[in-house]
Design a protein with these regions (language model features):
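A short, flexible beta-alpha/helix-coil linker loop
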Residues: 101-104, 161, 307-311
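Conserved S-adenosyl-L-methionine
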Residues: 176-295, 310, 318-320
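SAM-dependent Rossmann-like transferase core, predominantly class I methyltransferases
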Residues: 154-187
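Short beta-strand/turn micro-motifs composed of small residues
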Residues: 11, 261, 341
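Non-catalytic nucleic-acid substrate-recognition regions in nucleic-acid-modifying enzymes
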Residues: 2-138, 390-391
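C-terminal edge-of-domain segments
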Residues: 142-158, 370, 379
Protein backbone atom coordinates (compact mmCIF):
# COMPACT_ATOMS: atom_id res chain seq x y z
CA UNK A 1 0.00 0.00 0.00
CA UNK A 2 1.32 3.45 -0.89
CA UNK A 3 2.63 5.58 1.98
CA UNK A 4 0.82 8.79 2.84
CA UNK A 5 2.46 12.13 2.19
CA UNK A 6 1.60 15.78 2.65
CA UNK A 7 -0.72 17.54 0.21
CA UNK A 8 -1.46 21.27 0.05
CA UNK A 9 -4.70 22.30 -1.64
CA UNK A 10 -5.09 25.98 -2.51
CA UNK A 11 -8.36 27.90 -2.56
CA UNK A 12 -9.73 31.44 -2.49
CA UNK A 13 -9.56 33.45 0.73
CA UNK A 14 -12.73 32.93 2.74
CA UNK A 15 -13.37 29.40 1.46
CA UNK A 16 -10.85 27.57 3.66
CA UNK A 17 -13.44 25.96 5.97
CA UNK A 18 -15.56 24.84 3.02
CA UNK A 19 -12.47 23.22 1.52
CA UNK A 20 -11.71 21.51 4.85
CA UNK A 21 -15.17 19.91 4.84
CA UNK A 22 -14.82 18.76 1.24
CA UNK A 23 -11.40 17.20 1.80
CA UNK A 24 -12.46 15.51 5.05
CA UNK A 25 -15.42 13.99 3.20
CA UNK A 26 -12.89 12.15 0.99
CA UNK A 27 -11.25 10.55 4.02
CA UNK A 28 -8.14 12.71 4.31
CA UNK A 29 -6.18 12.64 7.57
CA UNK A 30 -4.73 15.47 9.66
CA UNK A 31 -6.67 18.12 7.77
CA UNK A 32 -6.06 21.70 8.86
CA UNK A 33 -6.74 25.09 7.29
CA UNK A 34 -4.11 27.63 6.31
CA UNK A 35 -4.46 31.03 4.64
CA UNK A 36 -5.98 30.35 1.21
CA UNK A 37 -5.08 26.66 1.52
CA UNK A 38 -5.67 23.42 3.38
CA UNK A 39 -2.97 20.95 4.34
CA UNK A 40 -3.63 17.23 4.80
CA UNK A 41 -2.08 13.77 4.55
CA UNK A 42 -3.00 11.38 1.79
CA UNK A 43 -1.79 9.26 -1.09
CA UNK A 44 -2.03 9.23 -4.86
CA UNK A 45 -5.69 8.21 -4.76
CA UNK A 46 -6.59 11.14 -2.52
CA UNK A 47 -4.58 13.52 -4.72
CA UNK A 48 -6.52 12.32 -7.77
CA UNK A 49 -9.85 12.57 -5.94
CA UNK A 50 -9.26 16.13 -4.76
CA UNK A 51 -8.39 17.14 -8.32
CA UNK A 52 -11.57 15.58 -9.69
CA UNK A 53 -14.16 15.90 -6.91
CA UNK A 54 -13.44 18.93 -4.71
CA UNK A 55 -15.33 22.02 -5.86
CA UNK A 56 -13.39 24.66 -3.92
CA UNK A 57 -9.88 23.48 -4.86
CA UNK A 58 -7.73 25.69 -7.11
CA UNK A 59 -4.51 23.66 -7.01
CA UNK A 60 -3.32 20.41 -5.43
CA UNK A 61 0.38 20.58 -4.60
CA UNK A 62 2.75 17.83 -3.47
CA UNK A 63 5.75 19.15 -1.47
CA UNK A 64 9.05 17.41 -2.23
CA UNK A 65 11.83 19.60 -0.81
CA UNK A 66 12.23 22.02 2.13
CA UNK A 67 15.29 24.09 2.96
CA UNK A 68 16.37 27.55 4.13
CA UNK A 69 17.74 30.37 1.98
CA UNK A 70 18.28 34.05 2.71
CA UNK A 71 19.44 35.32 -0.68
CA UNK A 72 19.36 34.37 -4.39
CA UNK A 73 22.76 32.65 -4.23
CA UNK A 74 21.59 30.42 -1.37
CA UNK A 75 18.43 29.62 -3.30
CA UNK A 76 20.34 28.83 -6.51
CA UNK A 77 22.87 26.57 -4.78
CA UNK A 78 20.29 24.64 -2.74
CA UNK A 79 18.11 24.06 -5.80
CA UNK A 80 21.10 22.93 -7.87
CA UNK A 81 21.97 20.33 -5.21
CA UNK A 82 18.72 18.50 -6.03
CA UNK A 83 19.15 15.75 -8.63
CA UNK A 84 16.80 17.15 -11.26
CA UNK A 85 17.99 14.60 -13.81
CA UNK A 86 15.95 12.01 -11.88
CA UNK A 87 12.83 14.20 -12.02
CA UNK A 88 12.94 15.61 -15.54
CA UNK A 89 14.25 14.60 -18.98
CA UNK A 90 15.95 16.88 -21.47
CA UNK A 91 13.10 16.36 -23.95
CA UNK A 92 10.50 17.51 -21.42
CA UNK A 93 9.33 21.02 -20.57
CA UNK A 94 8.84 22.68 -17.20
CA UNK A 95 7.98 25.98 -15.57
CA UNK A 96 8.26 27.53 -12.11
CA UNK A 97 5.52 29.50 -10.34
CA UNK A 98 6.52 31.41 -7.21
CA UNK A 99 4.83 32.93 -4.17
CA UNK A 100 7.10 34.84 -1.80
CA UNK A 101 6.50 36.71 1.45
CA UNK A 102 8.96 38.26 3.87
CA UNK A 103 12.05 40.43 3.74
CA UNK A 104 14.52 38.06 2.04
CA UNK A 105 12.75 37.55 -1.30
CA UNK A 106 10.56 40.47 -2.28
CA UNK A 107 10.22 39.69 -6.01
CA UNK A 108 8.50 36.37 -6.71
CA UNK A 109 9.34 36.42 -10.43
CA UNK A 110 13.05 36.82 -9.73
CA UNK A 111 12.92 33.93 -7.26
CA UNK A 112 11.22 31.76 -9.90
CA UNK A 113 13.91 32.68 -12.46
CA UNK A 114 16.63 31.77 -9.96
CA UNK A 115 15.14 28.29 -9.52
CA UNK A 116 14.75 27.90 -13.29
CA UNK A 117 18.40 28.88 -13.85
CA UNK A 118 19.62 26.37 -11.27
CA UNK A 119 17.69 23.56 -12.94
CA UNK A 120 18.78 24.30 -16.53
CA UNK A 121 22.39 24.89 -15.47
CA UNK A 122 22.48 21.44 -13.88
CA UNK A 123 21.29 19.88 -17.14
CA UNK A 124 23.87 21.85 -19.13
CA UNK A 125 26.61 20.64 -16.76
CA UNK A 126 25.53 16.99 -17.08
CA UNK A 127 24.25 16.68 -20.66
CA UNK A 128 25.32 19.84 -22.44
CA UNK A 129 21.67 20.55 -23.30
CA UNK A 130 18.71 21.74 -21.26
CA UNK A 131 14.92 21.18 -21.07
CA UNK A 132 12.76 23.96 -22.45
CA UNK A 133 10.36 26.24 -20.62
CA UNK A 134 6.63 26.02 -21.33
CA UNK A 135 4.45 28.22 -19.16
CA UNK A 136 1.14 27.12 -20.71
CA UNK A 137 1.26 23.33 -20.74
CA UNK A 138 4.53 22.05 -19.25
CA UNK A 139 5.35 18.43 -18.53
CA UNK A 140 6.29 19.44 -14.99
CA UNK A 141 4.98 22.50 -13.18
CA UNK A 142 7.02 23.40 -10.11
CA UNK A 143 5.61 25.64 -7.40
CA UNK A 144 8.00 27.65 -5.25
CA UNK A 145 6.82 28.93 -1.87
CA UNK A 146 9.09 31.17 0.21
CA UNK A 147 8.10 32.56 3.59
CA UNK A 148 10.91 34.61 5.11
CA UNK A 149 13.88 32.20 4.73
CA UNK A 150 11.86 28.95 4.59
CA UNK A 151 11.72 27.53 1.06
CA UNK A 152 9.36 24.80 -0.13
CA UNK A 153 9.41 23.26 -3.59
CA UNK A 154 6.24 21.50 -4.66
CA UNK A 155 4.98 19.59 -7.68
CA UNK A 156 1.74 20.99 -9.08
CA UNK A 157 -0.52 17.99 -9.74
CA UNK A 158 -3.35 20.08 -11.20
CA UNK A 159 -1.65 21.89 -14.06
CA UNK A 160 -4.06 24.57 -15.17
CA UNK A 161 -5.99 26.01 -12.21
CA UNK A 162 -8.96 23.84 -11.26
CA UNK A 163 -11.37 26.73 -11.62
CA UNK A 164 -11.04 26.05 -15.35
CA UNK A 165 -13.81 23.45 -15.30
CA UNK A 166 -14.08 23.12 -19.06
CA UNK A 167 -17.72 24.14 -19.57
CA UNK A 168 -17.26 27.90 -19.87
CA UNK A 169 -16.55 28.64 -23.53
CA UNK A 170 -17.49 32.33 -23.43
CA UNK A 171 -17.64 34.94 -20.67
CA UNK A 172 -19.28 38.30 -20.13
CA UNK A 173 -17.24 41.09 -18.54
CA UNK A 174 -15.73 40.35 -15.10
CA UNK A 175 -17.02 36.76 -14.81
CA UNK A 176 -17.08 35.08 -11.42
CA UNK A 177 -14.42 32.44 -10.77
CA UNK A 178 -15.98 28.96 -10.79
CA UNK A 179 -14.34 27.97 -7.50
CA UNK A 180 -15.67 31.11 -5.80
CA UNK A 181 -19.14 30.38 -7.18
CA UNK A 182 -19.03 26.81 -5.85
CA UNK A 183 -17.82 28.09 -2.47
CA UNK A 184 -20.55 30.73 -2.18
CA UNK A 185 -23.20 28.09 -2.89
CA UNK A 186 -21.88 25.94 -0.05
CA UNK A 187 -21.52 28.93 2.30
CA UNK A 188 -25.29 29.49 2.03
CA UNK A 189 -25.86 26.07 3.57
CA UNK A 190 -27.95 24.99 0.57
CA UNK A 191 -28.35 21.22 0.49
CA UNK A 192 -30.08 21.02 -2.90
CA UNK A 193 -33.34 20.73 -0.96
CA UNK A 194 -35.12 23.80 -2.36
CA UNK A 195 -35.16 26.13 -5.36
CA UNK A 196 -32.04 28.07 -6.42
CA UNK A 197 -32.12 31.42 -8.25
CA UNK A 198 -29.51 33.75 -9.74
CA UNK A 199 -31.16 36.99 -10.89
CA UNK A 200 -28.03 38.55 -12.41
CA UNK A 201 -26.49 35.45 -13.93
CA UNK A 202 -23.98 36.99 -16.36
CA UNK A 203 -22.11 34.10 -18.01
CA UNK A 204 -24.13 31.55 -16.03
CA UNK A 205 -21.39 30.38 -13.67
CA UNK A 206 -23.47 30.36 -10.46
CA UNK A 207 -26.46 28.42 -11.87
CA UNK A 208 -24.16 25.94 -13.62
CA UNK A 209 -22.20 25.36 -10.41
CA UNK A 210 -25.49 25.04 -8.50
CA UNK A 211 -26.76 22.42 -10.96
CA UNK A 212 -23.48 20.50 -10.75
CA UNK A 213 -23.64 20.59 -6.94
CA UNK A 214 -27.30 19.54 -6.80
CA UNK A 215 -26.86 16.74 -9.34
CA UNK A 216 -23.50 15.60 -7.90
CA UNK A 217 -21.69 16.25 -11.19
CA UNK A 218 -17.96 16.29 -10.29
CA UNK A 219 -16.23 19.63 -10.86
CA UNK A 220 -13.70 17.88 -13.10
CA UNK A 221 -16.38 16.21 -15.23
CA UNK A 222 -15.90 18.47 -18.29
CA UNK A 223 -12.13 18.81 -17.98
CA UNK A 224 -9.62 16.86 -20.07
CA UNK A 225 -6.12 17.47 -18.65
CA UNK A 226 -4.39 17.51 -15.26
CA UNK A 227 -0.72 18.01 -14.47
CA UNK A 228 -0.21 14.58 -12.87
CA UNK A 229 -1.07 12.87 -16.18
CA UNK A 230 2.47 13.73 -17.37
CA UNK A 231 4.20 12.40 -14.27
CA UNK A 232 6.19 9.17 -14.55
CA UNK A 233 4.09 7.52 -11.84
CA UNK A 234 0.73 8.38 -13.45
CA UNK A 235 -1.72 5.51 -12.80
CA UNK A 236 -4.28 5.59 -15.61
CA UNK A 237 -6.20 2.62 -14.22
CA UNK A 238 -6.58 4.24 -10.79
CA UNK A 239 -7.63 7.53 -12.39
CA UNK A 240 -10.25 5.79 -14.51
CA UNK A 241 -11.68 4.02 -11.46
CA UNK A 242 -11.88 7.26 -9.48
CA UNK A 243 -13.72 9.02 -12.30
CA UNK A 244 -16.16 6.15 -12.78
CA UNK A 245 -16.95 5.99 -9.05
CA UNK A 246 -17.57 9.75 -8.87
CA UNK A 247 -19.61 9.85 -12.08
CA UNK A 248 -21.81 7.01 -10.84
CA UNK A 249 -23.17 9.36 -8.14
CA UNK A 250 -24.68 11.80 -10.67
CA UNK A 251 -28.41 12.13 -10.01
CA UNK A 252 -31.52 14.18 -10.81
CA UNK A 253 -32.61 17.31 -8.91
CA UNK A 254 -36.20 17.70 -7.72
CA UNK A 255 -36.40 21.51 -7.47
CA UNK A 256 -35.97 24.50 -9.79
CA UNK A 257 -32.76 26.26 -10.81
CA UNK A 258 -33.47 29.63 -12.42
CA UNK A 259 -31.02 32.00 -14.10
CA UNK A 260 -31.93 35.42 -15.46
CA UNK A 261 -30.25 38.60 -16.67
CA UNK A 262 -31.51 41.74 -18.35
CA UNK A 263 -28.60 41.79 -20.80
CA UNK A 264 -29.27 39.94 -24.09
CA UNK A 265 -25.52 39.45 -24.54
CA UNK A 266 -25.14 37.88 -21.08
CA UNK A 267 -28.10 35.56 -21.63
CA UNK A 268 -26.71 34.44 -24.99
CA UNK A 269 -23.33 33.67 -23.41
CA UNK A 270 -24.95 31.87 -20.47
CA UNK A 271 -27.07 29.83 -22.88
CA UNK A 272 -23.97 28.70 -24.75
CA UNK A 273 -22.21 27.66 -21.54
CA UNK A 274 -25.28 25.90 -20.16
CA UNK A 275 -25.76 24.01 -23.42
CA UNK A 276 -22.09 22.99 -23.52
CA UNK A 277 -22.51 21.57 -20.01
CA UNK A 278 -25.66 19.70 -21.21
CA UNK A 279 -27.70 21.38 -18.48
CA UNK A 280 -30.26 23.13 -20.70
CA UNK A 281 -33.02 20.86 -19.36
CA UNK A 282 -31.99 21.48 -15.73
CA UNK A 283 -31.54 25.28 -15.67
CA UNK A 284 -34.42 27.59 -16.57
CA UNK A 285 -32.72 30.54 -18.31
CA UNK A 286 -34.56 33.75 -19.22
CA UNK A 287 -33.87 37.33 -20.31
CA UNK A 288 -35.61 39.30 -17.62
CA UNK A 289 -34.83 42.14 -15.26
CA UNK A 290 -34.79 41.11 -11.61
CA UNK A 291 -37.73 43.34 -10.63
CA UNK A 292 -39.88 41.75 -13.37
CA UNK A 293 -39.18 38.23 -12.15
CA UNK A 294 -41.90 36.20 -10.44
CA UNK A 295 -39.98 33.51 -8.53
CA UNK A 296 -41.17 29.90 -8.24
CA UNK A 297 -43.40 28.92 -5.36
CA UNK A 298 -41.95 27.28 -2.29
CA UNK A 299 -39.13 29.68 -1.47
CA UNK A 300 -35.47 28.82 -1.81
CA UNK A 301 -32.02 30.34 -2.10
CA UNK A 302 -31.19 33.46 -4.13
CA UNK A 303 -27.61 34.53 -4.87
CA UNK A 304 -27.06 37.94 -6.46
CA UNK A 305 -23.73 39.01 -7.91
CA UNK A 306 -24.47 42.62 -8.88
CA UNK A 307 -22.05 44.67 -10.97
CA UNK A 308 -19.38 46.22 -8.76
CA UNK A 309 -15.79 47.34 -8.84
CA UNK A 310 -15.08 48.40 -12.43
CA UNK A 311 -18.29 46.90 -13.78
CA UNK A 312 -20.60 49.82 -13.01
CA UNK A 313 -20.50 53.61 -13.08
CA UNK A 314 -20.44 55.04 -9.56
CA UNK A 315 -23.57 57.14 -10.07
CA UNK A 316 -25.64 54.03 -10.82
CA UNK A 317 -24.55 51.93 -7.83
CA UNK A 318 -26.78 53.41 -5.12
CA UNK A 319 -29.88 53.21 -7.32
CA UNK A 320 -29.12 49.60 -8.27
CA UNK A 321 -28.82 48.52 -4.64
CA UNK A 322 -32.01 50.35 -3.70
CA UNK A 323 -33.78 48.52 -6.52
CA UNK A 324 -32.38 45.18 -5.36
CA UNK A 325 -33.64 45.76 -1.81
CA UNK A 326 -37.09 46.84 -2.98
CA UNK A 327 -37.41 43.82 -5.27
CA UNK A 328 -36.29 41.35 -2.62
CA UNK A 329 -38.70 42.77 -0.06
CA UNK A 330 -41.75 42.68 -2.34
CA UNK A 331 -41.10 39.77 -4.73
CA UNK A 332 -39.02 37.26 -2.80
CA UNK A 333 -40.89 36.66 0.44
CA UNK A 334 -40.00 33.28 1.90
CA UNK A 335 -36.57 33.25 0.24
CA UNK A 336 -33.12 33.36 1.79
CA UNK A 337 -31.23 35.91 -0.31
CA UNK A 338 -27.47 36.35 -0.53
CA UNK A 339 -25.51 39.17 -2.16
CA UNK A 340 -21.77 39.47 -2.79
CA UNK A 341 -20.29 42.96 -2.93
CA UNK A 342 -17.11 44.92 -2.33
CA UNK A 343 -19.01 48.16 -1.65
CA UNK A 344 -20.02 48.56 2.00
CA UNK A 345 -21.51 52.01 1.34
CA UNK A 346 -23.73 50.82 -1.50
CA UNK A 347 -24.79 47.82 0.57
CA UNK A 348 -26.57 50.13 3.02
CA UNK A 349 -28.86 51.23 0.18
CA UNK A 350 -30.41 47.75 0.06
CA UNK A 351 -32.46 48.90 3.06
CA UNK A 352 -32.72 45.44 4.63
CA UNK A 353 -31.06 44.18 7.80
CA UNK A 354 -28.43 41.51 7.09
CA UNK A 355 -28.58 38.31 9.13
CA UNK A 356 -25.02 37.23 8.21
CA UNK A 357 -21.88 38.74 6.68
CA UNK A 358 -19.06 36.47 5.49
CA UNK A 359 -15.73 37.94 4.29
CA UNK A 360 -14.58 36.49 0.95
CA UNK A 361 -12.24 37.59 -1.82
CA UNK A 362 -13.27 37.87 -5.46
CA UNK A 363 -9.86 37.96 -7.11
CA UNK A 364 -8.15 41.12 -5.78
CA UNK A 365 -11.39 42.52 -4.33
CA UNK A 366 -12.17 42.11 -0.64
CA UNK A 367 -15.90 41.42 -0.50
CA UNK A 368 -18.73 40.58 1.87
CA UNK A 369 -21.17 37.76 1.22
CA UNK A 370 -24.31 39.06 2.89
CA UNK A 371 -27.50 37.22 3.83
CA UNK A 372 -31.00 38.70 3.95
CA UNK A 373 -33.94 36.64 5.21
CA UNK A 374 -37.08 37.82 3.40
CA UNK A 375 -39.96 36.84 5.67
CA UNK A 376 -43.54 36.30 4.58
CA UNK A 377 -45.37 39.09 6.36
CA UNK A 378 -43.52 41.20 8.92
CA UNK A 379 -40.65 40.17 11.16
CA UNK A 380 -42.98 40.80 14.10
CA UNK A 381 -45.46 38.27 12.70
CA UNK A 382 -42.68 35.72 12.19
CA UNK A 383 -41.48 36.06 15.79
CA UNK A 384 -45.05 35.69 17.03
CA UNK A 385 -45.49 32.47 15.02
CA UNK A 386 -42.20 31.10 16.34
CA UNK A 387 -43.24 31.91 19.92
CA UNK A 388 -46.52 30.03 19.45
CA UNK A 389 -44.70 27.01 18.00
CA UNK A 390 -42.31 26.91 20.98
CA UNK A 391 -45.13 27.00 23.56
Amino acid sequence: MEDNYQLITKTAAGLEEVLVREIKALGAKNVRPMHRAVICEGNKELMYRINYEVRTALKVLKPFKNFFAKNPDDLYNKVKEINWCELLRTDQTFCVDAVTTGRFFTHSQYAALTVKDAIVDQFRDVYGIRPNINTLNPDLRISLHIREDKVTLLFDSSGESLHHRGYRKQVDKAPMNEVLAAGLIQLTGWKADCNFLDCMCGSGTLPIEAAMYAMKIPPGYYRKQWGFMKWDDYDAELWQRIREEADAKICDFDYEIWASDRSPKAVAIAEGNINYAHLQHDIHLMKKDMHDLTPPEGGGIVIINPPYGDRLEEDDIDHLYEEIGHTLKHNFQGFQCWLITDDAVALRHVGLKPTAKIPVWNGPLECRFVRFDIFEGSLKDKKAREAEENN
